[in-house]
Amino acid sequence: MNVNEDGKVYDPSWLVLLANEQLPELDWLPEALNVCRHIHAETSAYIYFVDPTNPNEPGSDWSFQENLILEDPQEGTLVLDILTNHRVGGIEFLSRLF
């Protein structure tokens, strides 16, 4: 995993559009994605927007709640890790796993 100490800048606008189109009933999701502007860490198939150290442990920033799925014509299936308080912890690009 490549940890970006300074928070590599990220443009989530394409994700906001997908969320508005595919999950309009989740009115909080576009704004939750819009604040994902710095990458904490990344692998070839995953972008972390929140520090994943000690997930779901007391004091950890990463407290998992659910997964949401978006489909992108170029990137394929995207799995969003949604944390407590409607935060997006990261995105897994399933097409990059194979």
Which sequence ranges carry the predicted segments?
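N-terminal domain-onset segments
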Residues: 1-65, 75
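Short, compact, well-ordered microdomains
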Residues: 63-98
